[in-house]
């Protein structure tokens, strides 16, 4: 009976070792679980970005206001008879701002 008990004990030790440290063990499970969590976070960010892009596409397809807004902001277009003004800061303020940026580096 002693040999059978020793054999069963050795089998139990081997099974426990393979469960904890072997291939597809708990270490691999926690690593894969962390990878899945990171991928889900990335997917959520990409889904939010895609939803925003689809909303912008729907807005551009549906109305003239969005097209006009993009033309004004990105291409600096104006309507006939309208004057476009661009406000530029003073040269002294620009020099001061660039000096502060260089000091921050």
Curated annotation (Swiss-Prot):
Ranges that cross the membrane: 4-21
Residue numbers on the Periplasmic membrane side: 22-105
UniProt KW keywords: Cell cycle, Cell division, Cell inner membrane, Cell membrane, Coiled coil, Membrane, Transmembrane, Transmembrane helix
Keyword DNA damage: no
Coiled-coil regions, chain positions: 33-62
Annotated Gene Ontology cellular component terms: cell division site; cell septum; plasma membrane
Cytoplasmic topological intervals: 1-3
Source organism: Klebsiella pneumoniae subsp. pneumoniae (strain ATCC 700721 / MGH 78578)
The protein's assembly and partners: Part of a complex composed of FtsB, FtsL and FtsQ.
Protein name: Cell division protein FtsB
Membrane topology qualifier: Single-pass type II membrane protein
Matches recorded under NCBIfam families: PRK00888.1
Keyword Cell division: yes
Record localization: Cell inner membrane
GO biological process: FtsZ-dependent cytokinesis
Similarity comment: Belongs to the FtsB family.
Protein purpose: Essential cell division protein. May link together the upstream cell division proteins, which are predominantly cytoplasmic, with the downstream cell division proteins, which are predominantly periplasmic.
């Amino acid at each position: 009976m002693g040999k059978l008990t020793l054999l069963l004990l050795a089998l139990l030790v081997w099974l426990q070792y393979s469960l904890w440290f072997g291939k597809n063990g708990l270490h691999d499970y926690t690593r894969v679980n962390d990878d899945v969590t990171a991928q889900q976070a990335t997917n959520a960010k990409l889904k939010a970005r895609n939803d925003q892009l689809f909303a912008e596409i729907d807005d551009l397809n549906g109305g003239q206001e969005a097209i006009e807004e993009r033309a004004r902001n990105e291409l600096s277009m104006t309507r006939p008879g309208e004057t476009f003004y661009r406000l530029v800061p003073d040269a002294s303020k620009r020099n001061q701002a660039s000096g502060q940026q260089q000091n921050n580096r």
